Amino acid sequence: MFDALLRYMRPVATAFVALLALLIPDNRTSHEPDAALSAILSRDFIQVFTRNTPTTYYEGRHGPTGFEYDLVRRFAESLDVSLSLNSVGNIGDVLSAVRDGRADLGAATLSLDPAEPGILYSRPIMSMQPMVIYHRGIPAPTTPEDLLGLDIAALRGSGTGRALRDLQKSLPELTWQETDELEVTDLIEMVEKGEFDAAVVYAHQFKLNRLFFPDVENGFMLGAPQSLVWAFPKDSGVALLQAANRLIDRLHASGQLDELIARYFGHDDYLEYVGARLFIRHAQARLPRYEAAFKEAARDTGFDWKLLAALGYQESHWKPRATSPTGVRGLMMLTNDTAAEVGVTNRLDPEQSIEGGATYLLHVKGRLQEEITEPDRTWMALAAYNVGLGHLYDAQKITEMQGGDPYKWADVRKALPLLQKRKWYSQVRHGYARGGEPVIYVRNIRRYYEILNYVDRSRRQFHHLGERDDTFPQTPFNTVPPVL
């Protein structure tokens, strides 16, 4: 199902050029055409209204992050002004702020809706595909008719709700519950807990969150793809809109927009549900015993403690007495030589092992070429932790031989498996290696790291997982009745 997702998310500007032209009237208003842009340049900041969600904007380890945050930050930089963000509760609040002029721009997973009054829309930024998701305990819905009789949830004001309304025209008996006071992750969690049979969300939103909810499965794509756009006040001129469109066009043409989409939404699904479920269970049962040690090692080495914890899980499933047939031992699975190098005297002591593993990873990272920047530097250090620096250098050489960038993990990871083929390992210094293993190794660590980040962020910002009631007793869902 997700193999086609990036295809759906490719820019779809061509199909909407004519429509967008219709959305921009010839007789603008009595305002100057550049009124909004002039005001922004004069005050030296742009006011953007958004929502605090994993797919739009949130506070990450190093400050604000998120797909739409990255885009509006670039837009502010292109105007040479500061960025002022105002996070509000729902899409309706964003559009109201745009409509009445409190916002210069709205960026909040908005879909193009020509019927929305008082709004001008940018060119399409990416395509968003509505998708039915469902609880694994029910028969899998595979057609729209299978939705009849199910308890379905959707977000009011979103394009996913419009997809259901479009479907209701051909299935008038269809009904569902909708709200504008929750986020997508709330809906997914409610399906996970069996409070709803199904929900309609965007495919990229589910893909970003699916491993955190192992009892939720993707059903089928519902309706046509929709366009993610920015919203601008209709009565403030079009110069700001045109400036945004120029930025979007540049990002499309340069490939930078595709890179951003892949960065935020293009992860491979390399952990199965069973693996995700097991990891979450181990994170609850085992990790608390070692969390303080990971945090201490993080303070000493500068790594995020959750990255070190993810590395430890990949190595031993957080088992302090783990031993491999090759003689590596302990929670971080250190060899005798590595342990001696980093001052570990007892590999089975979890605190020593964690500190030693973090120190060794820092040493490896420090021996990489200075041209390698983050986050590639961390991913390559992890690969070298697994396969050895010599083999990583060999993979970089093969990458260069193939015309790739030896300082980019996306290129080097393609070359690593070639170390298993005589044609390639015979041309490099360190010879044969099981080069596919470090690729899977880094993939798994990144996904474990994502899950730990999600849980940590949930504690502080979103859901407070495990600390709240099992239901949402005060949630104001409204029933959308059948049209019989």
UniProtKB/Swiss-Prot annotation:
Residues 1-30 form the signal peptide. Residues 31-268 are annotated as: Non-LT domain. PROSITE patterns: TRANSGLYCOSYLASE. Residues 269-484 are annotated as: LT domain. PANTHER family: MEMBRANE-BOUND LYTIC MUREIN TRANSGLYCOSYLASE F. The N-terminal domain does not have lytic activity and probably modulates enzymatic activity. The C-terminal domain is the catalytic active domain. This is Membrane-bound lytic murein transglycosylase F. In the N-terminal section; belongs to the bacterial solute-binding protein 3 family. In the C-terminal section; belongs to the transglycosylase Slt family. It is found in: Cell outer membrane. Keywords: Cell outer membrane, Cell wall biogenesis/degradation, Lyase, Membrane, Signal. Gene3D superfamilies: 1.10.530.10, Periplasmic binding protein-like II. It is a peripheral membrane protein. It catalyses: Exolytic cleavage of the (1->4)-beta-glycosidic linkage between N-acetylmuramic acid (MurNAc) and N-acetylglucosamine (GlcNAc) residues in peptidoglycan, from either the reducing or the non-reducing ends of the peptidoglycan chains, with concomitant formation of a 1,6-anhydrobond in the MurNAc residue. GO terms for molecular function: peptidoglycan lytic transglycosylase activity. SMART domains: PBPb (SM00062). Murein-degrading enzyme that degrades murein glycan strands and insoluble, high-molecular weight murein sacculi, with the concomitant formation of a 1,6-anhydromuramoyl product. Lytic transglycosylases (LTs) play an integral role in the metabolism of the peptidoglycan (PG) sacculus. Their lytic action creates space within the PG sacculus to allow for its expansion as well as for the insertion of various structures such as secretion systems and flagella. The lineage of its organism: Bacteria, Pseudomonadati, Pseudomonadota, Gammaproteobacteria, Oceanospirillales. Its EC number is 4.2.2.n1. One of its GO terms (biological process) is peptidoglycan metabolic process.
